[in-house]
Amino acid sequence: MLKKVFLKTFKLDKFSQLLYRENSYNCIERFIERETSNYTISIQTNILLEKFQKYISQLSNADLAFLLIHSGLIPEHYKPDSSEETFYSKLCEDLIREWSVRIGFTKSYLPTMKSSTEDVTILNDRNELIVCDGKAFRLGRSQAAPNVKDMLKEGDISKWLHPHTSLYTTIGGMVVFPSTHDWKSSTDFYQYTSNKKQPILALNYEHLSYMLIKGITSDFIINSLKNYHEIFPEQLRKKDSKIKNRDKYYENFENFENYFFGDDLEFWNLFKEFSSIVINEKCFDTASKLTTRIDSVKASIIQNFLCTRQISQNPYPIRILPS
């Protein structure tokens, strides 16, 4: 249960009511269902995206912050590689774009060419550019040890930055992913993302939410990437790490210039506790809906089986009259 003191602290008081939380948990799924049902043929992604951008632009910072906390979790009942799954992933990417605009990257956009490009192009008025890879996964997918290549291929960020170098000041990269699919031990991923030769910020959706709530601006992201050599003077190699390089990564990042925490480490720890409760409730909501769907399908199968058996046992079979 969400403690009201958490909600008051983060100015999310309305979410003390379950109805508002459930609306947020199901926000993207219901949006897709509502918009796709209005078309007799498949809706194009760009049309759906336009509608979604208009919708989320009207959300308050509090609504967007709460939505970000539990983002990146694809509904389990979507078929693999289905249009619904594609839509959901794309709309999660657009949440990142909307977040970046609100903290000061006012020229951010989603590239129209998907192949071999970043998911979100993050850009400010000074033409400083960051390429971002936004991730969304199913809860049922392996969480304890995700495949590193599914998260980020080494060299991708450099490849995506290259086409922008002639027009913009390229700063580095970002990867945003749900904390439910983070590693529990050292991994090549945090070795890649701690390489000062190619700065790459690895952030959970909760980090984005926290920045929005605390009023942390785009300058923090820019300064972090520009001073990556100070945050990670040495690469956090998987085999050399005395502690988990995942833990060391966030210890270094979150303590950089004491800017992320500010003077209030307690606030950040409270927010992480709050976020964990929100995500657990979201997971429970997902599991409950999946169970309901399974029970419904099971009941339908049983009903069809009984009807079939009743027909096969009919003592008065249908006779075909001679022609």
Put a short name on every predicted segment:
Residues 189-300:
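Charged, structured surface patches that assemble and position nucleic-acid processing machinery
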Residues 88-92:
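Conserved alpha-helical elements of sugar-nucleotide-dependent glycosyltransferases
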Residues 2, 182-183, 209:
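Active-site loop/lid in soluble adenylation, ligation, and acyl-transfer enzymes
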Residues 136-194, 202:
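Catalytic cores of nucleic-acid endonucleases
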Residues 122-133:
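Active-site beta-strand-loop-beta-strand hairpin of nuclease catalytic cores
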Residues 93, 97-120:
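A short acidic/basic microdomain associated with nuclease active sites
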Residues 115-118, 126, 167-170, 196-197:
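Short, well-ordered loop/turn elements at secondary-structure boundaries
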Residues 2-87, 274-323:
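Interdomain/boundary linker segments immediately adjacent to catalytic/signaling cores
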